[in-house]
Structures are given as structure tokens and as C-alpha cells.
Amino acid sequence: MTFDPSEGQGGIEGRAMAYTACLVKRGIHVEVAALSTGSKTSEEHYQGTKLVHLSSSFFRLPWTLRSLVRMMTRSSLDSVFLLSGGSTGTGILILCYSRLTRRRSGVLFYGRDLLQSRRRPTGRISLMLPLLLADGVGTNSKYTRSLLPFRPRNPPVIVYPGVERSIASEFPRAGRNQSEQHILFVGRLVWRKGADLLLTAFGQLRAELPSAKLDIVGDGPELSNLLALANKLGLGDSVTFHGALFGRRLWEIYAEASLLVLPSRQSAHDVEGFGTVFLEAGMFGVPSVGTRTGGIPEAVIDGVTGKLVQPEKTDELLSAMKSLLDDPRELERLGANARERAMKFSWERSTDQVLRLLGYVRNQEGLMANPRTREQR
């Protein structure tokens, strides 16, 4: 179960499709239940997999639960994995049903969901229940694991994201114009991502590196404020707002970049649990500048694959960007290290970790097999 892949192909939605592809490739039958803001239930086949769109509305909860139960019983599904929504009412009820019917269940947390659950009056209970009910609990980083309110029944599994490693070979770094200095931002345009801090630092950088360009990829509620800030700073055509990009166009932007910068902040209810964009940039040999917050230090190794600065310190951000753009050798060294490290993060390996938290093991043929059937449980 996840959020609706048709509503975006980044983040959690992209994970859902990557895991589905890996599981199907291994001969495992998969069906995806996608919660969306719509009110109607519909069914389609997406990349060869049955995808059922269900409403996340509270008022549609009985119908959503009925549809989920039908999916599980008609197809004799023996495992349920909540890729997102583990602490929601729908997620908790499905975990209860899975436990009653002796189906394996697992849930994955990202950091932001754990912090936001604390805002609700019933937040502590909604966090405790999935940890008690699920057979396996995963987190997207060691940092996110540290946010769990208590240790679940089985040790939590770290499930890092993967990258599409084959794509990078289509965009060789050797073909890039080294004289062009392109700084890249990829992310939702929300306060926590810190695009405003990047614009401010970039405005100062332009005074010393007038040929530098900034590409901002993403969409969100802060777009109008960011456009106004760019205009106020007089950045003109040195900044390009591309909107949300996916697929080949996004890969082309990565391949053209000199440096990825994501100056994330942390608030009481939101955090960067890991930062898949750092791995995506690394896949193209692009080093990163990030902040020492949340799980970012697990994605960017300071001095090895990029640089880390303190959150909201535009002077540190400016210094890090300038020092790297002024030193092509260092930029190349960090980029090579970033690529080497990113290539270790495959979706196949990430899928192995998902199956591990669900209690599967490898058999002699190299496939993942469930050592305990429902009858044995």
C-alpha cells in the first residue's frame, strides 16, 4: 500500500514502482493499493501490475477497507507491506486484519511521517500500534530509526533507497561543457527544503562567479515566494525554474549539473529522513552540498562525496559552493567518489531489505522464500 503513483513519480511513489518492478522480475506476484485524494475506486494495470486506486478520505474509509480486504483474499496474498501510511487509520486497520488472518506484514517509516504523527492528539497511539502489530519495521535511515518511540518486536531494518544505475551510462560526464557552472536544486518547493537560502547564497555567489547558473527543479506552495525572491535579488535569467520533472528530462538536468545543493532545514514536524536526490546526483558524478540535519549525513559523506554545512547558514553555504566551483579538481574528485558510492545503492538490494523485514530468506535457487507459511503461524 502506498500513495497514488499517478500523482507524482518522485519520493515514495517512485519507490513503490521500483520495488514492484524488482519483485515482479523475481517472479513474485504483486498488487498495489494506492491511496489518493479522489473519492472513487478504480482499477488499472501499471507496468504489468494490478494497481487499485482507493480514496484516502475518512468518509470513504469503510469502502476503502472493504476493497483492501477483497484484494488480499481474492488473490490469496500472504504478505502486506505498507510502503507509506503505516500510522494512518487505514494502515493500522490493515495491519490488524493481517495479524488476525496470519499474513505477514511490514511497514516503512521515513522520518517526516514519525514527526508529523506526533502533532495529532492520538499521535503516540498511532505510532505505537504499527510497531506492535507489524512483523517487520523498516526505516529509510539510521537517523529515522532513532526517531522510533520504542523498539518494535523485531529489530528494525534499515532500507536505504536505490538508484537506476543503468541510466547514468547514457549521460557520460566526458561530454559535459566543463566551462559552464550549473548549480542544481531538486526537491519540493516547501520551506523545509531551503530553496530560499540557496537563492540568497547564489545571489552573493554571482558577484564573484557571474557565469554561474542555477536550475531549480520542483513544484510546491513556495513557488510564488521563490519567484519573488529571485526577482528581488535581480537574478534574471541566471535562475531557471523548471517545475517538476521526471524521467529522461530530469536525468538530462542532472547530467548537465556541476553541483547539487539542497540546504534543508529541520522543523519540529518535518525533516529530511535521507535524501535520495543526493544519490541520484552522485549517479551522474555530481557532488553535493547538504546540511547537517536529519539523515543527510548518511547520504552525503562530508569531504568524500560532497560537503556538509550547518542549516540556515548562508555564509557557510556560499563558502562551500564557491570553494568547489573554484576548484575543478576537487569537484571532479568528489564527483567520482559520489558516483562510486551511488552505484552501491541498487533497487535490487533495497528490495532485499524489504523482503528481509517481511521475514523472507534466500533459498538455494537464489530466490526469496517465506520460511513460515500461514499454516505454521
Task: Report each predicted region and the residues it spans.
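Conserved donor-binding/catalytic core segment of Leloir-type glycosyltransferases
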Residues: G175-K193, L199-F202, R206, L260
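Acidic donor-binding loop of glycosyltransferase active sites
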Residues: S238, A255-D270, V286
